[in-house]
Amino acid sequence: MAVGKNKRLTKGKKGQKKKIIDPFTKKDWYDVKAPSQFAVRNIGKTLVNRTSGTKIASDGLKGRVFEVSLADLQNGEIAFRKFRLIAEEVLGKSVLTNFHGMSMTSDKLKSLVKKWQTLIEAHIDAKTTDGYLLRFFAIGFTKKRPNQIKKTAYAKTSQCRSIRKKMTDIITREVSAIDLKEVVNRLIPDSIGKDIEKSCQSIYPLHDVYIRKVKVLKKPKLDTAKLLELHGEGVASSGDAGSAVRRDGYEPPVQESV
């Protein structure tokens, strides 16, 4: 008789279930922090695999983009404007973010388009003082002149061209003289759109003038010290509340429609 293992005795039971391991036991939660110019600093949490061997958790977090409504960032009612924030640095259990773009909700944009008026759009590339190249998309609509009887408010092609040039000049002039932090401060109340509306009154009356979208095309190398300054010298000292953004001499426009 051959000496060896009895294979039948070593076999396991058929249909035996595998041990189920919960994947969340290998993950950690991190707090996502918005820059200090927003009223609400703690905007949510994000999940990432724990540091294991050569795979570092912070590397998996950097570059993540979070889209947050302005109403959630400012405890306000303007929910149609959305800000994109990109994870730049990880400090302890906190993810420090920076501005990565802005857009308006599609339902708000569709509600602005009406009959008997002209839609005017412009897109402009402008560079900030700290090296960020941004692309701005502006939108505006013509409206009736005071005491106008005619129901239509159509602008001529030459007037549209002049308004478009005015949009380009105002955005380029304002953005090229300030840094990214100040650009965000002006996007929160959309004061650039109000400036365009006032400047174009002599060409043709406008209403519902907005910066509908902002893209970050190029950005300089990450400066950690500047990022910490943007977040109020570290998360531990800054807390969960930011500072209110105000602009002297600026009054927010009255919303004709929601």
UniProtKB/Swiss-Prot annotation:
Keywords: Cytoplasm, Ribonucleoprotein, Ribosomal protein. One of its GO terms (biological process) is translation. GO terms for molecular function: structural constituent of ribosome. It is found in: Cytoplasm. Transmembrane segments: none annotated. SMART domains: Ribosomal_S3Ae (SM01397). Residues 235-258 are annotated as: Disordered. PROSITE patterns: RIBOSOMAL_S3AE. One of its GO terms (cellular component) is cytosolic small ribosomal subunit. The keyword rRNA-binding does not apply. Component of the small ribosomal subunit. Mature ribosomes consist of a small (40S) and a large (60S) subunit. The 40S subunit contains about 33 different proteins and 1 molecule of RNA (18S). The 60S subunit contains about 49 different proteins and 3 molecules of RNA (28S, 5.8S and 5S). Belongs to the eukaryotic ribosomal protein eS1 family. This is Small ribosomal subunit protein eS1. It comes from Trichoplax adhaerens. The lineage of its organism: Eukaryota, Metazoa, Placozoa, Uniplacotomia, Trichoplacea.
